[in-house]
Amino acid sequence: ISRHGENYRIQLSITCIDDSLTFDGKSVTGASLELLLSLLTKPSADENGFSPEQLSTEIRLTAEDIESEINDKRSYAMTRMLETMCADEIYGLTKNEILENVKKVTPQSLLAAWKFMLKNGIIQLNAIGNISEDDCKKKLREAFSDVGERTPYEPETVFVEEAEDLTELTEELTMNQSKLVLGFRGGMTDENDDFYSRRIMTDVFGGGPYSRLFMNVREKLSLCYYCSARLIRGKGIIVIQSGIEKENRQKVLDEINRQLDIMKNGEFSDEDFEASKKAICDAYRSFNDTPDAVSYT
């Protein structure tokens, strides 16, 4: 399960050998696709819902996973920042709110959610390898033949172009390394709004070892253990993450803001710009290196 904007995406995948490599000449790819589709359209449930015992186990495991995030302080700090920054948006749904909803799931409500997904979810099938496109389409239609008429749609994500004020949250925890996370509205109206310019800007600012945050905050001034920036495209938010000693907090903030002003004033070098473009292009080219990478792009 992954999050894209204010929507969740469920990904199911299966890997098998090519049919030409089987001993008996049977179609492994076709059988694998049928198995994958059956997991989606024919789960272990009846008219009364999913198995209470299996559901109870999944609720417990999911709750444990949510509650354990605090053990990963970097991830926890990121989550708390987004919860605070997007407090009035679906994107800012808190860990406790999610946990409360998870514990309320029943066999019947889960069955209803599954049916809703089949009726309204956008289904995308990526098949990589020596497999017939027509065969894939045929098996997909057969798998959904009992679903009836579908009305697929994806709810729109709210993009906030500019923050009205500054919100700050500090939590005291026992740990060796403090975490500083900053969130900025990227001025985007949707996920495609001048995306590539913003992608390069974020990369020059804090995307790699050539970036201004890495070269100055970490290397030149030695104010942190790490300092990086990334763009959450699906929500239009630029996030800066840094591991610091708490006594250096203000110094780190001042230097990050100084580097941001340099970016805003266009005072970065042509070398920085070209290094960023090369790194991003190389990353996009690498998507073709493996079947898995191709299937998820």
What are these regions (language model features)?
Residues I1, L182, N192-G206, M215-V217:
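Active/ligand-binding-proximal structured segments within catalytic/core domains
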Residues N48-I59, Y76-L82, E97-I98, P152-L166:
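Short, surface-exposed recognition loops or helix-turn segments adjacent to catalytic cores
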Residues Y91, N101, F116-K119, Q124-T189:
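An aromatic/glycine/proline-enriched structural segment found at the starts
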Residues K26-S27, L36-G49, I59-E67:
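Hydrophobic alpha-helical hairpins/lids featuring a short glycine-rich hinge
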Residues E64-S68, T167-M175, D282-D289:
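Short, low-order "capping/linker" segments at domain edges
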Residues I1-K42, S75-E97, I122-I128, L182, ...:
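M16 family metallopeptidases and their MPP-like homologs
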